[in-house]
C-alpha cells in the first residue's frame, strides 16, 4: 500500500447474491420479535437516545476496544473506536463499543501471558452474550492480538482485526532507538560502566516517543503482521504507524467493511484455513518475527480444530529466509518498514512461496490484495535472492532436554553459538538468577550455558519473558554480549541473543529441565535442530526420583484456575476447556 493508505478503501467487492436477510441477523433475536422481552430491549435502546431506524434491519457491530489509561500502546484506540464506528454507520450498520481487558505488556505482572486466555474468554463471551452480528477487534500490544482473535474464532461471527500500529521511531542524541531492543543493549552498557546515570535518564525520554506498539519486530509487530497475513485485517493495515493519518482512515475502512462481511457471513472459519496459516508462518519467517508467535499461532489453530504444531514452523523456517531488515534481526525500525512498502510489499516479494488463493476479510484473495505492491527501500525489505539472513527466524530443537521441543531465533544470535557445547550454571528460579548474575566473583566464562528453571506456563506462572537471561555482569565488563541461555520461559520479541526458550515439557511439571544441575554439559546444534543434555539416563532417573515439585503459587482465584487448566508451550498454552470446535448454544432470551 502507499504511505497514504488509500488502497484500504478501494477495490473491495461484495456479492449481493449471497446477502443475508435482516431477519437472519443474530441481533434480530433480541430486537425483532413482538414479545415483551424484545420490547424491553428496544425500549432500552431508546433510553440511549436512539430511534428504531438507527438499528432496524441493520447489523449490530460490536467494537471490542482494549483501550486503557495505563496501556500506552493503545492510548489512541479511544479515538480510533470512533473512526471505526463512523465507518460502520456509513455502511449501514449499528455500532456498539464494548470495552475489554487491556493487556499492557510493560505494566501487567507477573506476565501478560497469564491473562491472554482470560481476554480470549472475555472477547468470546462479550460477543455471545450481546446482540452482536459482527465484530471489530481493536488490539495490538502483544497478547491482545491472539486473545481477541481466539475469542472471535470460538464465537464464530464475522470479525475484522484492527491493529494499533507501531510507535514512531525512538531517538537519542541523533541515533534512532528501538523500544525494548535498545533498552536491553544500553542496559548492558550501563552495567559495564560505559554510560552514565545521566545518559540513561536521557535515553529514558527518547526511546518511546509516541503512542503505539513497540516499533521493532517484537511480538506486537509480529502478531499484527500475522493477523494481516492470515487474512483477518485489511491489506497493509499492520504496517501503518499509530500516529500516521492513514491509521484512522484504515479504522473507518474496517468499520465499513465489517458490515458487508456480516451480510456475506464471512467468518474466521472461512478465512483461517491451513493454507492461510502456512502463509502467515512464511510471513513470520520473512519478517524475522518473535518466537512468541509460535505459541499464539498454535493456540489459534487449535481453536479451529486444525492439527498444527511447532514442527510446521520449523519446516517453513528452513525454506524462508529473513527479508525484513528490522531490529532485532536487522537494523531498521517499523516506521522505516512502512515507508519501504510495508507488509504488502514484503508479501509480494514472497508471492512465489504463498498460496495466493486464500480468502481474506476483503472478500478477495491474498493474491489480489498484494498485487502491484512495490518495495521502495530495498535495504529495508530485501528480495528472496538477497536476504538479510539465511538463518531462519525460528528454529525448533528437540532432544533429551526438550522431548516436545524448544525454540530459538537464530537470526538474532551470534553465529558462533549456533553450534556449541558448554558447562551449565543452573538457577532454580528467577530471583536466584537475578542475584547470581550480578556477582563479580561468579565462576563463569563466555562458554558456559545459563539454565533457568520454573519459568514455564505453570512454573512462572504465566510463562514470563525471562528467557533473555542477563549476561553475567563479570562478562559484560569483559565485552561479552551473547552466550547460550536455556529456559522454559519466553522472551520479549524485542529481545535477542542465543536464547533457547519454551522448553517442553516445562520443569515445574517434571520435564527434564528440572533435573539439570550446575556442572552438567549441554550441547546445542541449531543446524541439526538438536539439543542434548550429556547426563546418563540412569543419573536422570535418580534425579527424577529425588525431585519434588514446587508448591503452587496460587491457592485460589483466577491463578488457581489457570494453573489447573493451562497447556504446555508446544500446545499453545490455551486452557484445556477452550480448545476445539464444540459448539456452544446461543443464549436463551427470556
Could you tell me what each predicted segment is?
Residues 14-69, 73, 80-100, 106, ...:
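Catalytic or ion-coupling anion/metal-binding cores of large enzyme and transporter domains
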Residues 128-148, 159-164:
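A short, small-residue-rich loop immediately preceding and capping a beta-strand
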Residues 1-15:
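N-terminal amphipathic/basic-hydrophobic helices that include classical n-h-c signal peptides
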Residues 118-130:
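Short, well-structured alpha-helical segments in soluble
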Residues 115:
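Glycine-rich phosphate- or other oxyanion-binding loops that anchor nucleotides, phosphorylated ligands
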Amino acid at each position: 500500500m502507499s504511505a497514504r493508505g488509500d488502497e484500504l478503501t478501494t477495490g473491495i467487492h461484495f456479492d449481493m447474491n449471497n446477502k443475508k436477510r435482516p431477519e437472519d441477523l443474530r441481533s434480530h433475536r433480541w430486537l425483532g420479535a413482538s414479545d415483551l422481552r424484545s420490547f424491553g430491549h428496544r425500549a432500552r435502546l431508546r433510553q440511549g437516545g436512539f430511534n428504531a431506524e438507527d438499528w432496524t434491519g441493520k447489523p449490530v457491530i460490536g467494537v471490542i476496544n482494549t483501550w486503557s489509561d495505563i496501556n500506552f500502546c493503545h492510548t489512541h484506540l479511544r479515538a480510533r473506536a470512533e473512526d471505526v464506528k463512523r465507518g460502520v454507520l456509513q455502511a449501514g450498520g449499528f455500532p456498539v463499543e464494548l470495552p475489554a481487558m487491556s493487556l499492557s505488556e510493560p505494566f501487567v505482572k507477573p506476565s501478560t501471558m497469564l491473562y491472554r486466555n482470560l481476554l480470549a474468554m472475555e472477547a468470546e463471551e462479550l460477543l455471545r452474550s450481546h446482540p452482536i452480528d459482527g465484530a471489530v477487534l481493536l488490539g495490538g500490544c502483544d497478547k491482545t492480538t491472539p486473545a481477541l482473535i481466539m475469542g472471535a474464532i470460538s464465537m464464530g461471527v464475522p470479525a475484522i482485526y484492527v491493529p494499533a500500529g507501531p510507535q514512531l521511531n525512538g531517538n537519542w542524541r541523533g541515533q534512532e532507538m528501538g523500544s525494548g531492543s535498545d533498552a536491553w543493549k544500553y542496559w548492558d552498557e550501563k552495567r559495564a560502566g560505559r554510560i552514565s546515570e545521566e545518559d540513561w535518564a536521557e535515553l529514558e525520554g527518547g526511546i518511546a516517543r509516541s503512542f503505539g506498539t513497540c516499533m521493532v519486530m517484537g511480538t506486537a509487530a509480529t502478531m499484527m503482521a500475522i493477523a494481516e497475513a492470515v487474512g483477518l485485517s485489511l491489506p497493509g493495515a499492520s504496517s501503518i504507524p499509530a500516529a500516521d493519518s492513514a491509521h484512522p482512515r484504515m479504522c473507518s475502512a474496517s468499520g465499513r467493511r465489517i458490515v458487508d462481511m456480516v451480510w456475506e457471513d464471512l467468518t474466521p472459519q472461512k478465512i483461517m484455513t491451513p493454507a492461510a496459516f502456512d502463509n502467515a508462518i512464511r510471513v513470520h519467517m520473512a519478517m524475522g518475527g518473535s518466537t512468541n508467535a509460535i505459541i499464539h499461532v498454535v493456540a489459534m489453530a487449535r481453536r479451529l480444530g486444525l492439527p498444527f504444531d511447532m514442527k510446521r514452523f520449523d519446516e517453513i523456517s528452513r525454506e524462508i529466509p529473513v527479508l525484513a531488515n528490522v531490529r532485532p534481526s536487522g537494523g531498521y525500525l517499523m516506521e522505516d518498514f512502512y515507508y519501504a512498502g510495508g507488509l504488502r510489499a514484503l508479501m509480494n516479494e514472497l508471492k512465489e512461496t504463498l498460496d495466493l488463493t486464500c480468502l481474506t476479510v476483503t472478500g478477495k484473495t491474498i493474491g489480489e490484495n498484494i498485487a502491484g505492491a512495490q518495495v521502495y527501500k530495498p535495504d529495508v525489505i530485501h528480495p528472496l535472492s538477497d536476504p538479510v539472513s539465511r538463518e531462519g527466524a525460528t528454529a525448533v530443537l528437540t532432544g533429551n532436554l526438550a522431548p516436545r521441543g524448544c525454540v530459538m531465533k537464530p537470526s538474532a544470535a551470534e553465529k558462533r553459538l549456533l553450534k556449541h557445547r558448554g558447562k551449565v550454571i543452573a538457577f532454580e528460579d528467577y530471583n536466584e538468577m537475578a542475584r547470581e548474575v550480578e556477582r563479580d566473583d561468579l565462576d563463569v566464562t563466555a562458554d558456559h550455558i545459563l539454565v533457568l528453571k520454573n519459568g514455564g506456563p505453570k512454573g512462572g506462572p504465566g510463562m514470563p519473558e525471562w528467557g533473555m537471561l542477563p549476561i553475567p555482569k563479570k562478562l559484560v565488563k569483559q565485552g561479552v554480549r551473547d552466550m547460550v541461555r536455556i529456559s522454559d520461559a519466553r522472551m520479549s520479541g524485542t529481545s535477542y541473543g542465543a536464547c533457547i526458550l519454551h522448553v517442553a515439557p516445562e520443569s515445574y511439571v517434571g520435564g527434564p529441565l528440572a533435573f539439570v544441575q550446575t556442572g552438567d554439559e549441554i550441547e546445542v546444534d541449531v543446524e541439526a535442530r538438536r539439543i542434548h543434555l550429556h547426563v546418563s539416563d540412569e543419573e536422570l532417573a535418580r534425579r527424577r526420583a529425588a525431585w519434588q515439585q514446587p508448591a503452587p503459587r496460587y491457592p485460589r482465584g483466577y491463578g488457581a484456575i489457570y494453573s489447573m487448566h493451562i497447556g504446555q508451550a508446544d500446545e499453545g498454552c490455551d486452557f484445556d476447556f477452550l480448545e476445539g470446535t464444540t459448539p456452544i448454544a446461543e443464549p436463551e432470551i427470556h
